[in-house]
């Protein structure tokens, strides 16, 4: 009877240990997923910022081009 009792305790102990290890791995996996999601969100946010910056540069380039064109036209065809 004592042998059976020890075997049962051993099985229960090993089951609890393996269960706790699985729970720990699950928590680590969830933490890694959260970090990956945060990194993806940062990447999407950075992309939005870059697109906004490129749009501003594009607008600035158009304005500078129009000003330069006006200066060149005034130089070539001066008003008298």
UniProtKB/Swiss-Prot annotation:
Propeptide residue range(s): 23-49
Taxonomic path: Eukaryota, Metazoa, Chordata, Craniata, Vertebrata
Keywords: Amphibian defense peptide, Antibiotic, Antimicrobial, Cleavage on pair of basic residues, Secreted, Signal
Keyword Protease: no
InterPro entries hit by this protein: Frog_antimicrobial_propeptide (IPR004275), FSAP (IPR016322)
Intracellular or extracellular location(s): Secreted
Source organism superkingdom: Eukaryota
Chief location: secreted
Tissues of expression: Expressed by the skin glands.
Function of the molecule: Has antibacterial activity.
GO cellular component: extracellular region
Any GO BP annotation: defense response to bacterium
Name of this chain's protein: Raniseptin-6
Record organism: Boana raniceps (Chaco tree frog)
Signal sequence extent: 1-22
Family: Belongs to the frog skin active peptide (FSAP) family. Dermaseptin subfamily.
Pfam families: FSAP_sig_propep
């Amino acid at each position: 009877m004592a042998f059976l009792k020890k075997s049962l305790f051993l099985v229960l102990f090993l089951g609890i240990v393996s269960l706790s290890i699985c729970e720990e791995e699950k928590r680590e996996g969830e933490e890694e997923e959260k970090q990956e999601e945060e990194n993806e969100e940062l990447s999407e946010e950075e992309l939005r910022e870059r697109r906004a910056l490129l749009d501003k540069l594009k607008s600035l380039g158009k304005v500078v081009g129009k000003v330069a064109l006006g200066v060149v036209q005034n130089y070539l065809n001066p008003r008298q």
